[in-house]
Design a protein with these regions (language model features):
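Class I S-adenosyl-L-methionine
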Residues: 1-101
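Conserved Class I SAM-dependent methyltransferase catalytic core
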Residues: 48, 88-92, 145-193
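Conserved beta-strand segments of alpha/beta enzyme cores
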Residues: 84, 105-106, 191
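A short acidic, Gly/Pro-enriched loop at the edge of an enzyme's catalytic core
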Residues: 116-126
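A short SAM/SAH-binding and catalytic strip from SAM-dependent methyltransferases
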Residues: 126-135
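Short glycine-enriched, charge-decorated loop/helix-capping segments at active-site entrances
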Residues: 139-144
Length: 193
């Protein structure tokens, strides 16, 4: 966020480079993404995949609904190499980087709420969901009133076939929130492994 803050002289060089390199629309999108764009460390990604391998997951249709530059795709285990990869990324620059890095993946540059994947289409939904105390506008889920992280978790669950797996990083508020509606939704639709 500091590189977007004109009031911080120690970041002036970075600020000027960003302004020069990006269109006004790209600049605003990049600045906005500093609020909730968090990239997952390779250690965490490998641990998630190790758990999936231990559960017997061998591949299939894999969804990463907030894929960033595609780190989950880049660290896909060899045992899952024949999988069909689907990614969604809201940020245009980040999404285009992912498309260049993983040209065989189907990566949509849009919000998860705008995707048209059929429920039950995926064998696995994996990722690091965006965190925040605000809602995403999705007519299918608005009535539930979920925060963005709980929205992602619940929609990921719906997108996975019966017997499929959802594996994701989320904030503590998914399990610790006073409002138990998202936990109930997840418990009714899936099984904690």
């Amino acid at each position: 966020p500091d590189a977007f803050d004109e009031s911080k002289p120690e970041w002036k060089r970075e600020f000027e480079k960003l302004k020069a390199a990006l269109t006004p629309e790209e600049y605003e999108a990049a600045r906005g993404s500093t609020l909730n764009a968090h990239y997952t460390s390779p250690t965490v990604i490998r641990a998630i995949y190790d758990a999936l391998v231990n559960l017997g997951f061998e591949g299939g249709r894999i969804l990463e609904p907030s894929c960033g530059v595609g780190n989950f795709f880049g660290l896909l285990p060899d045992s899952m190499a024949d999988s069909q990869l689907y990614g969604v990324e809201l940020d245009s620059i980040t999404g285009r980087i992912a498309q260049q890095l993983y040209p065989d993946a189907n990566i949509e540059i849009t919000g998860f709420e705008n995707t048209k994947f059929a429920d039950g289409f995926f064998d696995l939904a994996v990722g690091n969901v965006p965190f925040g105390n605000y809602q995403v506008f999705d007519p299918e889920y608005n009535r539930l009133g979920f925060s963005i992280h709980n929205y992602f978790a619940c929609k990921m669950l719906d997108q996975v076939r019966p017997g499929g797996i959802v594996a994701f990083v989320t904030s503590r508020y998914t399990m610790d929130a006073k409002d138990e509606s998202a936990r109930r939704y997840l418990a009714e639709g899936g099984e904690l492994l």
